[in-house]
């Protein structure tokens, strides 16, 4: 298949099984999102097939980058390139909404942690004060 072919999310999201496993990896800073058919690599992946199947049919760039793959792994990935990820208006809107929801979810956890930390500090300070008397 030509690396020039473009795929939309609806097409990519149909490839989520051991028979056909596609991933979107990449961003604007490294040549744009690309589509990879990693089906033949599932059994050879050091982290196991399940890791890739968990993010199959979707944007897996964050997961790929968080792992810190080696230069060799990045070079190997090029063997599975099938095309470019074409972001249409509907997909872009969905991706933005998902990113905002994820950021909001992340921030809500931070607020709770801060409250718990402050409460623990107040309890520890109160205990310290009673012991000093």
Swiss-Prot record:
Transmembrane segments: 108-128
Predominant subcellular localization, coarse grouping: endoplasmic reticulum
Cellular compartment(s): Endoplasmic reticulum membrane
Keyword vocabulary terms for this entry: Electron transport, Endoplasmic reticulum, Heme, Iron, Membrane, Metal-binding, Transmembrane, Transmembrane helix, Transport
Gene3D superfamilies, per the entry: Cytochrome b5-like heme/steroid binding domain
The protein's name in its UniProt record: Cytochrome b5
Pfam families listed in its UniProt record: Cyt-b5
Listed InterPro entries: Cyt_B5-like_heme/steroid-bd, Cyt_B5-like_heme/steroid_sf, Cyt_B5_heme-BS, Cytochrome_b5
Domain Cytochrome b5 heme-binding, first and last residues per copy: 4-86
GO molecular function: heme binding; metal ion binding
């Amino acid at each position: 298949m030509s690396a020039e072919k473009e795929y939309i999310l609806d097409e990519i999201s149909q490839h989520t099984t051991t028979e056909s496993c596609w991933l979107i990896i990449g961003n604007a800073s490294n040549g744009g999102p690309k589509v990879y058919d990693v089906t033949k690599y599932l059994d050879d992946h050091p982290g196991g097939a399940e890791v890739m199947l968990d993010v199959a049919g979707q944007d897996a760039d964050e997961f790929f980058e968080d792992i810190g793959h080696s230069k060799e792994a990045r070079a190997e990935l090029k063997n599975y390139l099938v095309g470019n990820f074409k972001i249409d208006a509907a997909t872009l809107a969905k991706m933005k909404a998902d990113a905002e929801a994820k950021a909001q979810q992340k921030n809500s956890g931070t607020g709770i942690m801060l409250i718990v930390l402050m409460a623990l500090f107040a309890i520890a300070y109160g205990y310290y004060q009673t012991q000093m008397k």
